């Protein structure tokens, strides 16, 4: 039994223009061998996530959903840069390949990174994973361990320090009552 998340069929209405993405990747100097096998990961709370599996590369593409969005709700550049800068101090971050801010490619900003094999924690795990109660417990412990490691990253002397919301931002969110 495999306990690795592999994605599933791309949902109707969420198809990806793979040819446009491939052309763009090639313009970035990325060599792609073979035809892409495209799958989509489900169960996320925000951005759409696709797997593009080539003979020589296994990639993940992240993009915002279609429709009206708050200006900062799906900031692909921020998501990309946080991970790219975090990788210097935290080894569990995937290698960032490229960020596209040219909406003429697929209609929105997106970024591509190398895939890391594993499980994507989410509210409903894919039934094909067939996890036992012990498997789910181990996954939860692993997620907590990684979050603890992440929060111990000394970001203050890295480019990450420049992208925060500033001192007191979280307190403001927690203690500001809606009017």
Model-derived segments and their meaning:
Residues 1-3, 7-9, 14, 25, 35, 49, 57, ...:
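Intrinsically disordered, low-complexity regions
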Residues 2-30:
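Juxta-kinase regulatory segment immediately upstream of eukaryotic protein kinase catalytic domains
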Residues 4, 33, 140-141:
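Short hydrophobic/aromatic segments of transmembrane alpha-helices and their interfaces
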Residues 28-34, 90-92:
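Short secondary-structure junctions
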Residues 39-174:
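ATP-binding pocket architecture of kinase catalytic cores
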Residues 175-179:
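Conserved small/polar residues in nucleotide/adenosyl-binding loops
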